[in-house]
Amino acid sequence: MEALLQSFRMRLDLTPTAYVRSFHDTINWNNRLIGILGQKGVGKSTMILQHIKMYDDISESLYVQADDFYFASHRIYDLALAFFQRGGKKLYIDEIHKYSGWNTEIKMIYDQLPLLKLVYSGSSVLDLKKGAKADLSRRTIEYFMPILSFREYLNISKAWNLKTASLDEILSGHIDFPYGEHRPIKYYKEYLQRGCYPYFSEEDFIIKLKQAVIATVEDDIPKYAEMTVAASVKLKKLMFMLAQSVPYKPNYTTLARDLDLSRNTLPDYIDYLEKSGLFNALREKSTGDGLLQKPEKLYLDNSNIIYALGLDKSDAGTIRETMFLSWTRHMCAVYSSKISDFEIDGITFEVGGRNKTGRQIKSAERGFVVKDDIEYAVGNTIPIWMFGFLY
């Protein structure tokens, strides 16, 4: 344990606290068992270390990574017990999905060490169902950490302190932006290519992001789904087929034939890609379980992934719709619209470029046109970048 403590202290010393994502404040850190999930690279590890550094009694806290060599010969439960017996009160376990059988041991810690608070993080939601097998779903409070919003990107890259905006504020054009000396469209276009992840300023950003995407498809999902090598190859092929066709309107019969897959198996593969955070599914509004519905369209999660996969020649309309859905889905229930592109709380949204008109939303009870090359909101026409201030 001493080596783990030394590694923890070193990581803590190297953790910056100049900027902490506002997502931190959405978490109730007083809960006994907290799960923080999200894509690789969105900043889960940094946020956890920042929380410890800023709010915890360091002598009573321990942060470990589940893929540490220490766990090749030690159980997480045994570490938790030894740490608790030494006076430990808060244990943070990062990359929990990399530890085989983690869900069972987390349940043991929760049940047998009731005075020890536990926070775990995972790079995706891939192990959610496995955790449920150990009844974790009734014990843990889980949070999903999204990509950086446009607002967060500006605050980090420009050292600003811009505030979030509600959907109503955005629809009325009330956004906290320093128009006097700065142009939002310029920064928005930068963000589209490399602004969705906290390491956007690193020189090899695109390479790292592509590696993270491929690792999710080649390693994380196959491990979760207990796939054969042949099946994992088909999953990777499916991912690239979908990525090159977004927004993709699923035709299960054609896809299954092209991949030599059972039509009954294909929905599971698409579900894995959605749960991994790489894709977002747009569905019709339903009174039943929406997750069981076949998606109307599939989008990559964000435009940075589009560029990282070398799909930068994608239609501008695809990128617009991708980011509108990516931002709004974290704060609102978003559905496909029967007369236009999207529907949120009964409001219809048509997403387009400078020449987009409101023709398609004329029959909507309440509708807005969302454009990507304007700076100001005028009437029911809203700049798309403003939706990047929702969180």
Which residues make up each language-model segment?
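Conserved lysine of the Walker
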Residues: 44-45
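A cross-kingdom feature that marks ATP-driven nucleic-acid transaction machinery
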Residues: 1-17, 27, 53-54, 66, ...
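Structural recognition of the conserved hydrophobic beta-strand(s) that form the central parallel beta-sheet
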Residues: 117-123, 144
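Hydrophobic anchor at the beta1->P-loop junction of P-loop NTPases
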Residues: 36
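Short regulatory helix/loop adjacent to the ATP-binding pocket of P-loop NTPases
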Residues: 126-141, 157-158
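Short glycine-rich substrate-engagement loop in P-loop NTPases that contacts/grips substrate
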Residues: 58-90
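Interdomain hinge/linker elements that couple catalytic modules in large macromolecular machines
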Residues: 2-7, 151, 158-303, 307
